[in-house]
From Swiss-Prot:
<dbReference type="InterPro" id="IPR003732">
    <property type="entry name" value="Daa-tRNA_deacyls_DTD"/>
</dbReference>
<dbReference type="InterPro" id="IPR023509">
    <property type="entry name" value="DTD-like_sf"/>
</dbReference>
<feature type="short sequence motif" description="Gly-cisPro motif, important for rejection of L-amino acids">
    <location>
        <begin position="137"/>
        <end position="138"/>
    </location>
</feature>
<keyword id="KW-0378">Hydrolase</keyword>
<dbReference type="GO" id="GO:0019478">
    <property type="term" value="P:D-amino acid catabolic process"/>
</dbReference>
<comment type="similarity">
    <text>Belongs to the DTD family.</text>
</comment>
<keyword id="KW-0694">RNA-binding</keyword>
<dbReference type="Pfam" id="PF02580">
    <property type="entry name" value="Tyr_Deacylase"/>
</dbReference>
<dbReference type="GO" id="GO:0051500">
    <property type="term" value="F:D-tyrosyl-tRNA(Tyr) deacylase activity"/>
</dbReference>
<dbReference type="GO" id="GO:0106026">
    <property type="term" value="F:Gly-tRNA(Ala) deacylase activity"/>
</dbReference>
<dbReference type="GO" id="GO:0005737">
    <property type="term" value="C:cytoplasm"/>
</dbReference>
<comment type="subunit">
    <text>Homodimer.</text>
</comment>
<keyword id="KW-0820">tRNA-binding</keyword>
<protein>
    <recommendedName>
        <fullName>D-aminoacyl-tRNA deacylase</fullName>
        <ecNumber>3.1.1.96</ecNumber>
    </recommendedName>
</protein>
<comment type="function">
    <text>An aminoacyl-tRNA editing enzyme that deacylates mischarged D-aminoacyl-tRNAs. Also deacylates mischarged glycyl-tRNA(Ala), protecting cells against glycine mischarging by AlaRS. Acts via tRNA-based rather than protein-based catalysis; rejects L-amino acids rather than detecting D-amino acids in the active site. By recycling D-aminoacyl-tRNA to D-amino acids and free tRNA molecules, this enzyme counteracts the toxicity associated with the formation of D-aminoacyl-tRNA entities in vivo and helps enforce protein L-homochirality.</text>
</comment>
<keyword id="KW-0963">Cytoplasm</keyword>
<dbReference type="GO" id="GO:0043908">
    <property type="term" value="F:Ser(Gly)-tRNA(Ala) hydrolase activity"/>
</dbReference>
């Protein structure tokens, strides 16, 4: 399971010209689900992402996690993260989970985020979405379990 996380000052996801989810300062999490992923990996990745200290403390050091910073979370499914780009000029999608499995694990991940009490917004799994963000820093990390 892969999370491309970005520290943002704001982010929103739009579907069919309607805002599906929006946050102010916090984390935009682009989530990719691979074939071998399961609930245990979703739990581990969620815990790691939410504990990852990429927000500045009073001294300007990256020392706070999203909860400590008072931030929010926007989770967007992105199957293109689970690709094979080692050969050729077109991505291969054989590493990605089947849609039903990916949806179940995406829902599991977002439910776990919500259960922590951090305000969590989402896109819609499988939808054609437009994501707008202001990356703060820029600060972007690739986390994988």
């Amino acid at each position: 399971m892969i999370a491309l996380i970005q520290r943002v000052t704001q982010a929103r996801v739009t579907i069919d010209n309607e805002v599906a989810g929006a946050i102010g300062p916090g984390l935009l999490i682009l989530l990719g689900v691979e074939r071998q992923d399961d609930e245990q990996k979703a739990a581990k990745l969620c815990e790691r992402v939410l504990a990852y200290r990429i927000f500045s403390d009073e001294q300007g050091k990256m020392n706070l996690n999203v909860r400590q910073s008072g931030g929010r979370v926007l989770v967007v499914s992105q199957f293109t993260l689970a690709v094979d780009t080692d050969r050729g000029l077109r991505p291969g999608f054989s590493r990605g989970a089947a849609p039903a499995d990916a949806r179940r694990l995406y829902d599991d991940f977002t439910d776990r985020c919500r259960q922590t009490g951090i305000r969590t917004e989402t896109g819609r799994f499988g939808a054609d979405m437009q994501v707008a963000l202001v990356n703060d820093g820029p600060v972007t990390f690739w986390l994988q379990v």
